[in-house]
Amino acid sequence: KNAVTVGMHQNRYQGAPDYIMQGSSRGPLDDGRIKPDVLAPGGYVWSCRAQEAADTGGSSGSSQWYLEYTGTSMATPNAAGAAAMIREYLEEIALRESPQGALVKALLILGAEDVGARDIPNNDEGWGRVNLRNSLAPPDGQGVWVDDRSLLSATGNSKSYTFDIDDSGDQFKAVLAWSDEAASTWSSTQLVNNLNLEVTDPNGLTYLGNDFANGRSTTGGNADSLNNVEVVLIDSAIVGTWTVEIIDANHGGSR
């Protein structure tokens, strides 16, 4: 549940990037959690090849040094490379020492973009296709703010943040991800520490994490008690002060 699970989409070389390939595993997990987390290019990808490699099945344009291949074995390195660049950016540009893995995961999901119909999250693409620019330097003057140092140590604890939106029409996206303890093998659900994401707009409307309809957050739903990733995504956020609150709904573990 703490790992980044990657599905694969086609690339422009042999098809449409919005096409999720048949060989990409689908969710959900047994307890209903959303998987995969993101998509990355996995169709007809060129990669370095070991000189001793004998497997050329399903490939074309193979040589002693390179191999063209299709599968999540190609998509996962693409996502891993994006994750490595996010970590390097946090350390070298943002000067954030030892960023947590959950923060890197959150930024991957923050920048992910829906493919095909507007229907995230879903069990084909999770939160969408990795887009490194959206994760680190979004267009149109939008900013990214992160926190991976705050601690919630007991049920009922909470942490709030406020953000001022000055231009109407801006998109507002909040991502909460945390590294959860391992649950019992026999547990029907795998979430141990249940955190909830709540976003309140200037008019007092509250959006709960992962409460989505037609690819965008909606009001009036229920808090998520399965996933250790929660997202709120709102198009055309209204001008004013928005409040993001992280609530420790059930501190079931030792940390």
Residue ranges and their predicted role:
Residues 1-47, 109-112, 170-182:
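Catalytic-core segments of hydrolase enzymes
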Residues 9, 24, 28, 68-77, ...:
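Hydrophobic alpha-helical scaffolding
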Residues 67, 121, 198-255:
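Noncatalytic accessory or regulatory domains flanking protease catalytic cores in secreted, cell-surface
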Residues 123-193, 201, 254:
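Secreted peptidase-domain scaffold signal
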